[in-house]
Amino acid sequence: MNSKTHLLLALTMLIWAGSFIFIKIGLKELDPFNLAFYRFLLASPLLMAWVFWKRGLAKPSGSEWLHLSVLALSGVTLLYAFQFLALKYTTATNASILINTSAVFVALWGLVKGEANPRKLAGVFLSFAGVVLIVSKGTLEFFSSKTIFGDVLMIVDGFLWAVYTVLGSKMLLKYDHETLTAYAFALGTIFLIPFALMSGFANPVTFNPETVAALLYLSILCSVFAYVVWYYALTNADSTSVAVYVYLVPLFTAIFAFYALNEKPDFFTAIGGIITIAGVYLTTAKQHQ
């Protein structure tokens, strides 16, 4: 991996870490469903235009639209509806750690299919222990934690991302990552409309500058620029080397949250985060021969 790719990946992790902060900022004025809807309403046409300019858009067949719809529902609509709702009830740091449970769910799916090995099993159990520490705050009174509802939603979010990953891997036999993501964004935006209607559409003309800045950051930087850079890196380096960078996101998020939101991670969040990320690394790292 060359130095340019290293720098771009580090920048991408900084941007994704900042997303948890800007979601918190956007939630000051907008409800979670409106924030998610407007984020992808802005991001979808931009990513579609990029893919069309770069290589043109492949036209899905009739049955493929159903598969794409399931992907969009799991990986965009429900994923971000739950994530934004979760961030009303949990900290940015907790959210950035718990979303990584997606790798554990993917590993569990592999175990169900008989792809078990001691390293992956150890990673699953280690991650589970870390998650329990974060959510319980080290007490047996598990459900007394102030962040329990948001934490559980983020674990559900991890499961949804795992569903998207597993189902999406089959579609990648025909479509490249960027095209698949562009279609998922577009369909996911449409499926977010009922959620926004349910909570009442917010009038974008009345948004304050903070909310506009949050939406621009989440849509242009997080959903378009960062994804384009991520897929660029995947074509210029092996996937394991690229994936390791994701483990920087919770660290960057904790630093940003401390200064921007005055969030102070407690001892159990810090230790639980380290254990969770270590477990995720064990489940995803390639075995050396």
Curated annotation (Swiss-Prot):
**Entry-linked SUPFAM superfamilies:** Multidrug resistance efflux transporter EmrE (SSF103481)
Write down the Pfam families for this protein, in alphabetical order: EamA
InterPro entries this protein is in? AA-Vitamin_Transporters, EamA_dom
Q: Which UniProt keywords apply?
A: Cell membrane, Membrane, Repeat, Transmembrane, Transmembrane helix, Transport
Transmembrane region(s): 7-27, 33-53, 65-85, 92-112, 123-143, 148-168, 182-202, 212-232, 241-261, 265-285
Annotated organism of origin: Archaeoglobus fulgidus (strain ATCC 49558 / DSM 4304 / JCM 9628 / NBRC 100126 / VC-16)
Q: Name one GO cellular component term.
A: plasma membrane
Q: Family, per the entry? A: Belongs to the EamA transporter family.
Location(s), subcellular = Cell membrane
Q: How does it sit in the membrane?
A: Multi-pass membrane protein
What is the protein's name according to its record?
Uncharacterized transporter AF_0510
Q: Which PANTHER family match?
A: EAMA DOMAIN-CONTAINING PROTEIN (PTHR32322:SF2), INNER MEMBRANE TRANSPORTER (PTHR32322)
Q: Does the keyword Glycoprotein apply?
A: no
| Sequence ranges assigned to domain EamA in this UniProt record | 14-136, 159-285
